[in-house]
């Protein structure tokens, strides 16, 4: 009896070719495809896997789990790798790995295969996660082993009658899920080349976006958005709705050269309309609900948390601890944020919360002012005392350039 390998199957170029490659190596292939909100025709993917020679194909709807257990932390933690990338693909990898391991256990498979290249981050994310969940499973990386160029891979697919939605004149590598869409390869490999229109799908060009701004109100409970303009949504549904709404206004385009885990720089084009709106709103709500010390320290945690996910370390003791900290900061991040969507921008122009720490009577400069300005004298004396003592000792501060 042949040994079984579970393949993380997307229906794209790499994994379609990988089915054929694994079959030639003498394995039975169990394909597994997760729906994490990417919007593709999964029935078509299911049939394609079987047509390619897989003995089984498991289609798993993990959209709700993805939104509740993974995207929720991206929101609560304001997670952005290098302050720019909302971790679109990176967030889904631990969940995909978890489901692959579950299928491997159910089907008595000896290992798991993925379609990642040898120079990307995903190979690390999948393999580290799989080994964290089941150290005994073998991991196969067909694309890394055959080391073909993109053009050679396309030629192989054509030669073996493998249908792939890709041609030499449009060789993009696209990954999409609920949280956004990433695009690389082709002309995008030149960091100075302007991305062509066909590189985008979720967002309008600014020239094609509506000429009138649109105001929306996003409501949060404990750091998670729960309604849009007064209508309640599940998190996954709210994200999909905002992707359409904000994408119409050209919101969420990111053109970024990032530092990959494997040591190279890579130009990536992302579309994250919902993520930009939600993150902007969430940060605005935190400004009135977090104490100063928490607000100043939380970005330190956010940076580390983002790097943990980007580097494939979701299943680790440190990440578990970071999640606990982030959760503890969100108890009072409840309220409403008003934003204006216009020509690529999601601009916050109002925020309110039943737990607001903003005291208008303390902040105002009108006659309603309740702030005791006389207390400033003593505060300044104490605050500036170390500076004063140092200057007394050294005869004044010398501003030497």
UniProtKB/Swiss-Prot annotation:
Q: Which CDD domains match?
A: ASS
Q: What InterPro entries does the database record attribute to this sequence?
A: Arginosuc_syn_C, Arginosuc_syn_N, Arginosuc_synth, Arginosuc_synth_CS, Arginosuc_synth_type_1_subfam, AS_cat/multimer_dom_body, Rossmann-like_a/b/a_fold
Q: What is its EC number?
A: 6.3.4.5
Q: What pathway is this protein a component of?
A: Amino-acid biosynthesis; L-arginine biosynthesis; L-arginine from L-ornithine and carbamoyl phosphate: step 2/3
The upper taxonomy is: Bacteria, Bacillati, Bacillota, Bacilli, Bacillales
Q: Which reaction does it catalyse?
A: L-citrulline + L-aspartate + ATP = 2-(N(omega)-L-arginino)succinate + AMP + diphosphate + H(+)
The coiled-coil regions, if any, are none
Q: Which UniProt keywords apply?
A: Amino-acid biosynthesis, Arginine biosynthesis, ATP-binding, Cytoplasm, Ligase, Nucleotide-binding
Where is it predominantly found? Answer: cytoplasm
The record ties this protein, via Pfam families, to: Arginosuc_syn_C, Arginosuc_synth
Q: Does the keyword Cell membrane apply?
A: no
Protein name stated in the entry: Argininosuccinate synthase
Gene Ontology cellular-component terms listed: cytoplasm
Native source species: Staphylococcus saprophyticus subsp. saprophyticus (strain ATCC 15305 / DSM 20229 / NCIMB 8711 / NCTC 7292 / S-41)
Q: Quaternary structure? A: Homotetramer.
Q: Which GO terms describe its biological process?
A: argininosuccinate metabolic process; L-arginine biosynthetic process; urea cycle
Q: Which residues bind L-aspartate?
A: 117, 121-122
- In which compartments does the protein localize? Cytoplasm
The question of whether Zinc is a record keyword is answered with no
Q: Which residues bind L-citrulline?
A: 85, 121, 125, 173, 182, 258, 270
**Residues that bind ATP:** 8-16, 115
Which PROSITE patterns did the record assign? ARGININOSUCCIN_SYN_1, ARGININOSUCCIN_SYN_2
Q: Which family does it belong to?
A: Belongs to the argininosuccinate synthase family. Type 1 subfamily.
Q: Which GO terms label this protein's molecular function in UniProt?
A: argininosuccinate synthase activity; ATP binding
């Amino acid at each position: 009896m042949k040994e079984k390998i579970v393949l993380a199957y997307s229906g794209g170029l790499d994994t379609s070719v990988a089915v054929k490659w694994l079959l030639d190596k003498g394995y039975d292939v169990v394909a597994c495809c997760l729906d994490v909100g990417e919007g593709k025709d999964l029935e078509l993917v299911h049939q394609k896997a079987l047509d390619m020679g897989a003995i089984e194909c498991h289609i798993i709807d993990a959209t709700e789990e993805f939104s509740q257990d993974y995207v929720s932390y991206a929101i609560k933690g304001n997670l952005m790798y290098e302050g720019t990338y909302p971790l679109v693909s990176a967030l889904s990898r631990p969940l995909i790995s978890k489901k692959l391991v579950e299928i491997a256990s159910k089907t008595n498979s000896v290992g798991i295969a993925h379609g990642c290249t040898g120079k990307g981050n995903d190979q690390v994310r999948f393999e580290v996660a799989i080994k964290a969940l089941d150290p005994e499973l073998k991991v196969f990386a067909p694309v890394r082993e055959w080391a073909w160029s993109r053009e050679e891979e396309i030629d192989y697919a054509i030669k073996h009658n493998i249908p792939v939605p890709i041609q030499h004149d449009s060789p993009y590598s696209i990954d999409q899920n609920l949280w956004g869409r990433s695009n690389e390869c082709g002309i995008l490999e030149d960091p100075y080349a302007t991305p062509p229109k066909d590189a985008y799908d979720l967002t309008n060009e600014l020239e094609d976006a509506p000429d009138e701004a649109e105001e929306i109100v996003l409501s949060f409970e404990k750091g998670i958005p729960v309604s849009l303009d007064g209508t309640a949504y599940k998190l996954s549904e709210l994200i999909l709705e905002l992707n359409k709404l904000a994408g119409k206004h050209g919101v969420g385009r990111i053109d970024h050269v990032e530092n990959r885990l494997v040591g190279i720089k890579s130009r990536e084009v992302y579309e994250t309309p919902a993520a930009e709106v939600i993150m902007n709103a969430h940060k605005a709500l935190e400004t009135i609900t977090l104490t100063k010390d928490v607000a100043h320290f939380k970005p330190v945690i956010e940076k580390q948390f983002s790097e943990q996910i980007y580097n494939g370390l979701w299943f680790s003791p440190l990440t578990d601890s970071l999640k606990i900290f982030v959760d503890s900061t969100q108890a009072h991040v409840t309220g409403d944020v008003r934003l204006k969507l216009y020509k690529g921008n999601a601009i916050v122009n109002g925020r309110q919360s039943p737990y607001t720490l903003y005291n208008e009577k303390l902040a105002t400069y009108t006659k309603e002012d309740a702030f005791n300005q006389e207390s400033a004298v003593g505060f300044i004396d104490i605050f500036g005392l170390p500076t004063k003592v140092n200057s007394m000792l050294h005869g004044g501060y010398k501003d030497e350039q």
